[in-house]
Amino acid sequence: MKQGFFTIIENKPLTELVYKMVLEGDTSAITNCGQFVDLRLPEKYLRRPISVCDYNETTLTLIYKIVGEGTAIMAKLPLGTRLDVLTGLGNGYDTSLSGDAPVLVGGGVGVPPMFNLAKKLVAEGKHPQVVLGFNTAEEIFLAEDFAALGIPVHIATADGSVGTKGFVTDVLKDLNYTYFYSCGPMPMFKAMEQVMTTSGQYSFEERMGCGFGACMGCTIQTANGYKRVCKDGPVFLREEVFA
C-alpha cells in the first residue's frame, strides 16, 4: 500500500451513469490486476474504494458508476484536481491457474477489473474470452476495448437489446473454458455456481469502510473462517467461498 497524490487528466461519461477517470501519478505500488485504490474526495471523510481498470507507470484508469453522493462528487471533479489516493490495495487475480483458455465474467461495475486481467492473460500468450452482463444496450461499456485485444466478447443483456437475452449464465452454459475469473454482485456469483464447470476466482464488491483491514466492515464467511474482503481479498478462490 502506498499513499500519494494523483492529478485528474480525464473524467468523462461512458454511459448515463458510468464514468471513466484517468489519474496521473506514481502507480508503482500496483503489482497485480484485480487490485483496487482508495480515493479521498473533497469534503468527504471516508475514502472511496474503486477497482483498477487499467494502469501503466504513470497513469491509473478507473471506471465508476454514480450510485451515491461520493461518486456524484467524483463525476463533477474538474481536470487538474489533485486527489489523495491509496494504491496497491488487495491481492488481485492469480493468472498462473488459468490454463490456456480462461473465461472472464463481469457484471455491471464488475466489468472494469476484467480489462487489465484480459490484457495480462493475452500478454502471457493465453487465449481468454470475456462475458459481459448489462441490463440494456444503453448501459454497455468497454466492450469495444475488450474486442481491440483480439479476444472473443460475449454480451448478455437482461432485455435482449444486444447479444444474448438474459444473464451471463445464459452465455456461460454454452462455452468451453479451462478456468474462470469473475467480478460482480453476489447474486451473479450464486447464479454462476449453478453452471460453472471448473475452478475459478471471484472478486467481491462488499461495501468497505477503511479499505485496508482495520474496521472489519467487509468480512465474509469462507471455508477458512471469516475473511476481510479489503485485506484478504477482494479475490477469493471458488473453493474458499462456495465450498
Task: List the model feature ranges, each with a label.
Residues 234-243:
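Short microdomains enriched in Cys/His and/or Lys/Arg
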